[in-house]
């Protein structure tokens, strides 16, 4: 997969993705995800019987981190912080839309 390929879709909230699926969606090696997981930089992921499972929110977070690291040469900790801030911004925008409803 090339960096400029665009994948569009919707993930059900009760669906879980594997490490390999998230790595493919982020165009990274699984080792990239493991390093970030070990450092606690990707929330909404859990290990069940030694197998990592990722929610849709974890996928979005990982994709944002990957983009920030690639596009801005950000260190992983900064990329994680920015991904957190972008998630907060998305949540606030959704609340404003609901208020304007």
Language-model features: locations:
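Arg/Lys-rich, alpha-helical DNA-contact motif
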Residues: 2-20, 24, 30, 34, ...
């Amino acid at each position: 997969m090339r960096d400029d390929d665009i994948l569009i879709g919707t993930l059900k909230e009760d669906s879980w993705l594997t490490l390999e699926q998230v790595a493919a969606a982020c165009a990274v090696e699984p080792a990239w995800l493991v390093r970030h997981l070990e450092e606690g930089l990707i929330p909404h992921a859990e290990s069940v019987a030694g197998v990592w499972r990722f929610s849709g929110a974890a996928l979005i977070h990982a994709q944002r981190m990957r983009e920030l690291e690639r596009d801005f040469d950000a260190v992983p900790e900064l990329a994680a912080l920015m991904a957190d801030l972008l998630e907060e911004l998305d949540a606030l925008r959704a609340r404003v839309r609901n208020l304007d409803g």
